[in-house]
A protein has these predicted regions:
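Primarily recognizes Gram-negative and organellar outer-membrane beta-barrels
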Residues: 1-189
Length: 189
């Protein structure tokens, strides 16, 4: 079994004046990978059929996940103690899950069943792709004894799943698109 993971984050903040105008730019990435191998043997004796079934099965499981995002925000003072903020983020994520099963049923000893290749009926390979856009617009009021904000967020998302190995590899699923939106209100005294 092997597992790897790597993540990173980069941020830049720049004040454009002393009244509250500023800009923020950020980026994130992540990668993880894992692989597991397993081996099993079974022997089944069928008394009524007077036969024996010997199965040796080797399974190689792999998964990996990759993601990255970029974001930017801009804050503008509009009048005393009040600021408008505009923020945008794009995020992409890809996930792979693969399980390749190699079978030796009665006649194929190890390692010959590797040469025959994996069993398509028992194996799978699925890739999922996700894209998310997020746009926020808000106004904030900051006072010595209280803080408040109101805004709205729009989040269009798309997802796609592709199966290239296994019994469902002939099914082509459509891309799914969703638009979420949410108002926000905050008051702190």
């Amino acid at each position: 079994s092997n597992n790897y993971s790597l993540n990173g984050n980069l941020m830049m903040f720049r004040r454009l004046n002393n009244k509250g105008r500023n800009i923020h730019v950020g980026a994130r990435f992540g990668y993880s990978d894992s692989e597991t191998d397993s081996y099993s043997e079974s022997s089944t004796e069928f008394f009524e059929l007077d036969s024996i079934s010997d199965i040796a099965r080797y399974t190689n499981r792999t998964s990996d996940s990759r993601n990255w995002s970029v974001s930017a925000s801009y804050t503008e003072p509009v009048f005393k103690n009040h600021f408008v903020q505009l923020r945008y983020e794009f995020a992409h994520r890809k996930q792979l899950a693969q399980s390749l099963v190699y079978d030796s049923i009665n006649k194929y000893p190890y390692p010959e069943y590797f040469e025959r290749g994996y069993d398509n009926e028992l194996s799978t390979k699925v890739e999922n792709f996700y894209d998310t856009h997020t746009a926020d617009l808000s106004i904030r009021g900051i006072h010595p004894k209280m803080m408040y904000s109101a805004g709205v967020s729009l989040t269009p998302q798309s997802s796609l799943s592709e199966t290239t190995i296994g019994p469902n590899s002939d099914r082509h699923l459509p891309q799914q698109n969703v638009l979420n939106w949410a108002p926000s209100v905050m008051f702190r005294y």
